[in-house]
Amino acid sequence: MKSELHIGYLIFISVVAALGGFLFGYDTAVISGTIKDVSTLFSLDAMQQGWYVGCALIGSIAGVSVAGVLRDRLGRKPVLILSAVLFTASAAGCAVCADFNQLVIYRIIGGVGIGMVSIVSPLYISEMAVPRYRGRLVSLYQLAVTVGFLGAYLVNFQLLEYAVAHAGENTDSTFGLLFIGQSWRGMLGMETVPALLFLIIAFFVPESPKWLIVERGRREKAVSILQRIYSDRREAEAQADCTASVLSDNASSSISMIFRPGIFKAVVCGVCIAILGQFMGVNAVLYYGPSIFEDAGLSQGDSLFYQVMVGLMNTLTTVLALVIIDKVGRKQLVYWGVSGMIVSLLLIAAYFLWGNTLGVSSLWLLFFFLAYVFCCAVSICAVVFVLLSEMYPARVRGLAMSIAGLALWIGTYLIGQLTPWMLSTLTPAGTFLVFAAMCVPYIYIMYRHIPETTGRSLEEIERHWTGGKC
């Protein structure tokens, strides 16, 4: 008879780790409401504006680069705490910075936190969760990211409304400066609230049992933590033994292990799905949606409203993905979702080619974008962090996830920099045709090379690669 699961405890530690995803989303999206005021205050030219937006991504690349090493040496929990410290320092520093250079430095610090948490949070959740619930629990991270996006949009809107309503009042006080005179400081500074919450409660989650066994050989400590999840000690010991048995053929962890045939294939596949996902258009839509809608002839107000609808669809669909990911399966979601993305992207391109000429309502463009975001959020956005946290052998998981995460952030940075150029040079229609074309190799790699991980233990998934089953 199987022991009873303490699902409430699993949810608690998953939510704590997923709070890092909320900070990821907030830190990424809040910048959109501050660009105009920051540019005016510090007299930024176009290149400096681009640097202001992109500097955090440079920090994210640095954070990803060191996250794997730090979490394998220090543990998953200390890196979560460190990322919370970085988020807090970044938000507070941005709120009180004296000049543009200081602002950039604090944004880079926050970016390092983003990079770390984007790797550590989903991995930590996957290592704590049982196979039955792992997909849904890891998807909490992606849900938290989308909620962070919405949270930033709402904070930006409310603080701007407050600043306008109280214009002319005394701004000599700190409160007046942050929320009236220079409300962009308040937008960035409000992140300190969830960051401090994350910092405090991160101390109350346990270390990953798998890390304790893999890196420290502390089986008894791992069993005691597993007993908080499994009510029966025998079941906890069985889980610990299962983890240890997978490691029996690997005496040590080293970079050279990455180049073993089965493991190297897993790493290459992870890099491919990480970077290709960024060139299928999702971040271009989330970052530059209002500009794209304005290119279609909409007013600034209508463009912002349409972007809010896109954000709401992203969040609501992520909730749906959270419910069905362990029932439908990772690969099935990708097949159907990416196929829908291709159709939606082709329809968006067609609208930009012929929509205005034929007098097609802009509501159809909104519908096509919502369909695209739905298909994307229910498939690649929901699946990528789950797969990257599941698919690697235990002894190289930290390094392999860092490599994939680095590829993801490089792709994010490139698409963020290239999208304005693509829209002006290739036209919006050509840009979305390129995004549609990039979906094809993604489906091929998923079909041909990635194993289905739904309902399988991390140890079973590891045997897929090391056993040479391709």
Mark where each language-model region is:
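N-terminal juxtamembrane cytosolic/stromal segments of multi-pass membrane proteins
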Residues: 221-222, 242
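Short, well-structured alpha-helical segments
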Residues: 233-247
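TPR/TPR-like (Sel1-like) alpha-helical repeat modules
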Residues: 219, 227-232
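Alpha-helical transmembrane bundle of multi-pass membrane proteins
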Residues: 1-218, 225, 248-470
